[in-house]
Design a protein with these regions (language model features):
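Positively charged n-region of N-terminal signal peptides that target proteins for export
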Residues: 2-6
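Charged, low-complexity intrinsically disordered terminal segments
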Residues: 17-161, 165-496
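Sec-dependent N-terminal signal peptides
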Residues: 7-16
Length: 496
């Protein structure tokens, strides 16, 4: 484990220790925000979480203070510092009586099956795996077989990212549960974005979780690994819990900066509440499975329809930030139609130099001339943007590693008043295969905030402005350009 995540989690644990155990989450909200509970009866409070550290602190604080239930749904849950310590915090919540349910997609799960069983052995913890046909409990032979016999199913993933606390507070957005999504990887971090919610939209988020949890796609880990369950003893589960707690409580894991930072951490959560913007919030989601599969790798979905509707109705401007930019069928034509109507379209995305996904970039690379001809303004993020010290307050301590930054936020502003923040990438996979979630909000205030953030990422010191005469593709090694050239030859666009 590296020192920087230890430093943050030390702060989180000390912050949590300052809160009165057993205090109801709603009561704490009422005590620290005089009119929040009254507003929550009809409106949803929303606070955009731009920085990884505040997004992580918010999750940790809510996990520590939930009293009844915590329901989390993620595409990726790593076994790195953030993933391990997040699991420890959930286990700690379960030990004080909170019902914890975890739903994770099967494709990119890091944890070994036995570790999952040891955690789910706690009576207050349930773990289910979405569409388990690749990793958990799947042999190498079965995995190869599934490529040929269940190709669409293998590619249909749950890309949702939600965390719900006592049915009162919720967080959704682009961040998975791993170091690089919270600015705590020393070498590569994502420029990401979440949104914290209080109020009716959280009820809609909860309904979506229940639909996925009870669907035929969500399989209890004990059912997947039934042959291993019998080998798990209470002593094994207790040892696993003790190991997690020992790591979290070991002062040797904490950096010397903790005492200085703790005085400020305790002020953060009330400050987040004071910065809430209150309005109607529409939570959008897909049904489990995305669609009925009758159109193969196509078919669209509820989230696809809603977002394309928002773009189609634009009157004067569309501003998009997406890590991957491969428009599905009809997308470029729609942008051209909008541009001809006088709608200004600007998109912030990754460059070849910053991207973590060369195959996805290849799809964008092929479409880029057509996007430019359609009137779209393109801004490609630099791997070492000038903004990096503002994204991460502790950047000076990382500078020696020269870390790469890449966009992972999925956001949109239409006509300076409608925003989207969620999990939807502007690519065929999000449009047709992966289930997605997010929020659509009509708010000039939040639109101004989000526009400022994206436009800052598009400044010359942070992004290259790609045109028909200039692209930054040569700002990378020859090896990466050769990789791009090879991938460009493959017919994989529907899967990107």
């Amino acid at each position: 484990f590296s020192m920087q995540p230890r430093f943050l989690w030390a702060c989180i644990l000390l912050l949590c220790a300052e809160v009165t155990p057993g205090q109801e989450l709603t009561q704490w909200i009422d005590d620290n925000c005089a009119d929040c509970l009254e507003k929550m009866e009809t409106l949803t409070g929303a606070r955009i979480l731009e920085q990884g550290e505040e997004a992580l602190v918010g999750r940790a604080w809510l996990t520590r203070n939930a009293q009844q239930s915590i329901d989390v749904q993620y595409f990726i849950w790593s076994t790195d510092n953030v993933g391990t310590l997040a699991a420890e915090q959930l286990l700690r919540a379960a030990e004080r009586g909170v019902a914890v349910r975890v739903l994770v997609d099967d494709l990119l799960i890091d944890a070994q099956g036995q570790s999952l069983l040891l955690l789910s052995a706690h009576p207050n913890v349930e773990i289910r795996i979405y569409n388990p046909n690749d990793t958990v409990g799947t042999s190498f032979y079965a995995r190869i077989k599934n490529v040929f016999t269940q190709f669409r199913s293998l590619n249909q993933r749950m890309h949702d990212k939600t965390a719900i606390y006592d049915g009162v507070a919720g967080i959704t957005g682009g961040r998975n549960m791993a170091d690089e999504y919270f600015d705590f990887d020393p070498n590569y971090n994502f420029r990401d974005r979440d949104i914290l919610l209080l109020g009716p939209a959280v009820s809609a988020m909860q309904e979506n979780f229940e639909e996925f949890w009870s669907s035929s796609f969500a399989i209890p880990v004990e059912e997947i690994l039934d042959s291993t369950v019998a080998t798990i003893t209470p002593a094994d589960a207790a040892l696993k819990a003790a190991e997690l707690h020992a790591y979290a409580e070991n002062p040797d894991n904490f950096g010397p900066e903790v005492q200085q930072a703790i005085a400020h951490l305790s002020e953060r959560i009330p400050k987040l509440l004071s910065q809430m913007s209150w309005q109607d919030v529409e939570f959008i989601s897909d049904a489990p499975g995305k669609n009925d599969g009758s159109q193969g790798l196509g078919g669209g979905g509820q989230s696809t329809n809603r977002l394309f509707e928002a773009v189609r109705n634009a009157k004067h401007s569309v501003l998009i930030q997406s890590p991957y930019l491969i428009l599905p069928k009809g997308g470029i034509e729609l942008f051209k139609e909008l541009s001809e109507r006088g709608v200004r379209i600007r998109i912030s995305t990754n460059s070849l130099a910053s991207t973590d996904n060369v195959p996805a970039f290849s799809g964008y690379h092929r479409q880029r001339p057509r996007l430019l001809n359609a009137g779209v303004e393109l801004f490609e993020f630099k791997p070492h943007p000038g903004i990096q010290s503002k994204l991460i307050a502790r950047y000076p301590s990382l500078a020696g590693n020269n870390p790469i930054f890449a966009i992972h936020a999925k956001s949109m502003v239409v006509d300076d008043e409608l925003i989207f923040i969620g999990t939807f990438n502007l690519d065929p996979r999000s449009a047709n295969l992966n289930t997605e979630v997010g929020v659509v909000i009509q708010s000039k205030e939040l639109a101004r905030q989000l526009t400022r953030s994206i436009e800052r990422d598009m400044l010359p010191e942070n992004s290259w402005h790609t045109t028909g005469e200039f692209s930054p593709d040569y700002e990378v090694s020859r090896g990466k350009r050769l990789e791009l050239g090879f991938v460009n030859l493959l017919p994989v666009e529907p899967l990107l």
